[in-house]
Amino acid sequence: MKAIIACLLYVVIQVESNEYYNVTYEPVQRQLLDFKKHHPRPIGLWTKNAGEPVDIRDTITINSDQFSNQLLIDTISTVAGERIPERVVTAKGTGAFGYFEVTHDVSKYTYADVFNGVGKKTPVVVRFASGFQNKGGSDLARDLKTMAVKFYTQEGNLDLLSISIPVFAFRDPMLSRDITHAFNRNPQTNMYDFTSFYDIVTLRPIFAHSLFWLMSDYGIPNGYRKMDAFPVHTYELASKHGEKYYVRFNFRTELGFSYLTTAEAAAIQSLDLDYFTRDLYNAIGSGQYPSWKLEMDVLSLHDLKKVDYNPFDVTTLWKNGTFYTVPIGRLVLNRNVKNHFRDVEQAAYNPGNLVPGIPGPVDYLSCGERMYYRDTQNYRLGRNHNKISVNMPLYEKTYVRDGTPPTNLNMKNAPNYYPNSFHGPVPYVDEHRPWKKLKVLETNAFDLEPAWYFYNYILEDEAHRLRFIANIVLTLVPVTPPVVQRAMKLLHLIDQDLGERVKAGYEVALAAQQALANATPAETMSFRRVPSAEGHPIQMSDPR
């Protein structure tokens, strides 16, 4: 009995001391104790939703008049409404605050205030996510990773939506729904289905190039901090002299790109589905602030007329030797969010959020994105989503009124129509804005050369090719035969060597799967479960 009392006393002393002694806790693990350390006393009286202080006798409702207990009514009536619609894509995510600092003079290319003035700092909020994972899914899926950056500039919010590979899957916005459906859960089984995945890839071979990037070492970066990110679209920039430039932005991690193999990701995933999220939070909480260099690949209007490829095609890379690269500045994340729902779940990023000097992309996919991103945010957050604190620009005066809260000051008593003669907000004339608009005519034809080039030149060595082929084989095993045959044909058309090696690996994997199905329980100990390209386990023999 004395031992038990002593043990309890020790625990109380440990907690009350607010010290960590010789135990090293990660910032993620010590969050609650850190809060207590910064608030030695309770932060105030608990109140009901309307502000009335809570009497301690109302905190227990057994054998009481529950009908008149407003605290109970507040609790029951609000808990069911704590969730908002989950994002259809990029649902599993995290984020942080930081700043962007201009390190190089790029006034030659754009008059955008955010990128002009060496040393200028602009606050940012960044959201990272996995492309097709649900909110409770795995960070370690072989999946597209995203990095959305919101710059709070003096001229409005600038949103750069980036992905972890430098090419996008398609260029026709009409395909957005179908690829989302095919890459998400099957409507009957509610499971990720590689048959639908490869079915749409073989019927729309334009997807092949981005698929190759995902099946390579670039498919699972070693956390968000060690990941490059690419806004993908070709942006039009305008200088103060009326000159136009066409650029592709790149965020290059200053830690250097690092990847996880499928086996490494499987080992981590068995212990921690939130590996990327934990790594980012702990790094910032420990003062190891992640950072990226922002640069842009540049083509002038004159250069544009000489290239022998479509520089606006988001499914392909620009050819080496046709452009030059210009550094702009550094993105640094130095502050974790205080409330995930407020700062990450409610954050709304829109490729249509641009600023003077950056007219933005001119391709058709970008035009489509500006529509469906806005529609998504209206559905998830309401039509006043830009009045939620994390989305609010530094300066805003509009003729938008009312609607579902938040409305904030709702422009108070200012005129609510334009034009008016009573001193409501007025527009200005942007003298530097280009007078002419570039019109890009695109084709729905696809070219297999980018995928061929990736296999032969971007995969830098034989070891990388072997991992790439193994990842493809792993995802083909559960696919039904007719679709597998089309996939094999497509791979053969891209590169004969690739097709033959994938076919050979596929046959070996099928044999291993059959052997496992026929094995005794003791024999199955030589097999283990590893995640597929989407982070969902399938059987294969131990590769060690």
Question: Which positions does each model-derived feature cover?
Answer:
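Active-site-adjacent core segments of small-molecule enzymes
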Residues: 2-4, 15-544
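Extended low-complexity, proline/serine/acidic/glycine-rich cytosolic segments
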Residues: 8-10
